[in-house]
Amino acid sequence: MSQQELPLFATSHQAQRGAVEIEPGAIWIPSWLGDREQIELVAACREWAKPPAGMRRPHMVDGSPFSTMSVCLGWHWYPYKYSRTCDDHDGAPVKAFPPILTDLGARACADTGFEATPFDAAIINYYAPGAKLGLHRDGSEGDDVIGRGSPVVTISLGDTCTFRLGNNRTRNRPHHDVQLASGDLLVFGGPARGAYHGVPRTDPGTGPAYLTLDGRLSVTLRESGQVEP
């Protein structure tokens, strides 16, 4: 069965009112989280960032550092693999995937027209002012997960960013730039699951004052495709 035949991604009229289809398989919902939910999620991120298995700066396989910092839940990700321990940091067991993210993942799928997805890995990225993330594809989840078009959920908190969603073939154009503000939701899967994407810039000082957050947090949920040994 081809990816197009899979009933994973529903047609855009089944998504929540206010949802914007950036391209087939990529849905953006502005102001998806209310003020109280954003405050609660930022507070949770601050707890998850504490050691052990806390926030760290990842490095590429060549040793070059990311400009973002991150903490993982459920499964620890580092280029380009998953582990139950923070192998590139303090070696501690990764924190459990929490119920709050299970609930948000289910709601995100329902509101964007995707089928329910068994999310089991989260990456919380922190963008200090000036941080960015180069164009890349999420490919560590394995052929089955990617081939099914299992969606990736991203919740934006704090400063507004430019999120660049490219194509499945190359880092070059065509691409779409979306201004993700605090509380916005972006989900991409189905035919967009293999798209290159990144964050070429953030806009310092644009986040809501009530979050007391200097910079931006992105909370990204994935189906890892991992099986316990």
Task: Label the model's feature ranges.
Residues 1-229:
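Non-heme Fe(II) oxygenase metal-center motifs and adjacent flexible, charged/small-residue loops
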